[in-house]
Amino acid sequence: MSLKQNSSNLTKFNNSRLVKALSSLLFLFLIFSLAFSPVEGKSKKSLYFPPKGDSWEKRKPEDLGMDSKLLQEAVEFALKNEWKGPKDLKKAIENSFSRESFFSIIGPTKERGETNGIVIRNGYVVAEWGDTERVDMTFSVTKSFLSTVAGLALDAGLIRDVQEPVKKYVKDGKFDSEHNAKITWHHLLNQTSDWSGTLWDRQDWADRPPKGATWDKIRNRKLIEPGKNFKYNDVRVNLLAYSLLQVWRLPLPVILREKIMDRIGASSAWRWHGYENSWVLIDGMKVQSVSGGGHWGGGMFISTRDQARFGLLFLRKGNWSGKQLISQKWVSMVQVPTPVVPVYGYMWWLNTKKLRIPSAPESVYFAAGFGGNYIVVDNEHDLVIVVRWTGDLDGVINRILASIR
């Protein structure tokens, strides 16, 4: 064999070895990519999830890249900036909404506790203040739990597509009018339906009417095409809850408990209420249709720690300790901005252009309720922050984020 031929064969051999080596490296890279989560470069198996009960592991802020002194300053700021509303939440509701036509409280209420909160970093508790195990009303934070039940229905195939008209699923007349027949699940979830009607003796037009408008003008207003206008409206949110009840054929709190809350180790103390007149028959069984907030009483009554678990589930994209409880697709869907109001998704608030929480990243999304109740999910910093009865959310968030080194 000539030197030239030997050199050619050696080149082919070396090229073959190079291809094999590159293939091996590519294979290892793919395995590594699948095995590891983008969160802090940790594998899914190594991510910490708190066990059921009150033994949620605490870590020193410095162990997780935070400054304990600055974090304590955030806690002290939160304690000094409590919401100024009355402890008697029945009175607080009446003070805020009694100007509405035919207003009355028809769901349970209770006195609230002191301001409290918790900060979760990488799954661990790094700060906590006040009584975080106390069960309190959480008002419109309830909407994010309701949205989750809708996501579970989509995952289970009970809802085929959020763009389908709700009329295909609810056939008792509530979606029969020419306008209401156009309303989809998508419209109910992002509060752009402009549904017209009465539910639980509450007219859609009587919820948060424009100041100075006459009742005749409001009642006779021109309906807006579904999807064209955002209107925060608890009658229509309660309609979503009622519609989901028709789909699930079981009480929504049972669905939430079995599929989410029990599996993330939440306590058994939380409750999800409806109204005294929101009982319906489902397959011969008397079931209460729950509310999406505490506007007329009712809604979720829950502790800060249980809400933190719920927030952590969404931070982990619907996965809890290796089990996908709600699809990652749904977690992404709730964060899609509504075109007519880009700071709102599927019953989660978004921080588009930092309009809602100026101190936080634009990617932050959060549940929000009357009286200063929040569950904040910050993917960029691997944080869940739950604050109850705060008068200055941005101030609290600003100081927490300033503690990250």
Annotate each predicted stretch with a short phrase.
Residues 2-5, 13, 21-24, 30, ...:
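N-terminal leader/targeting segments and the immediately adjacent pre-domain N-terminus
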Residues 57-58, 79, 83-108, 138, ...:
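Active-site-proximal loop and beta-strand segments within enzyme catalytic domains
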Residues 67, 123, 137-162, 188, ...:
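Active-site SXXK
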Residues 125-134, 198-276, 298:
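Catalytic-site signature segments of enzymes, centered on catalytic residues
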Residues 144-148, 236-243, 296-319, 373-389:
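Active-site-proximal alpha-helical segments within enzyme catalytic domains
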Residues 156-194, 248-296:
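Active-site helix/loop module of the DD-peptidase/beta-lactamase fold
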Residues 394-405:
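Short, gly/Ser/Thr-rich active-site loops of penicillin-recognizing serine hydrolases
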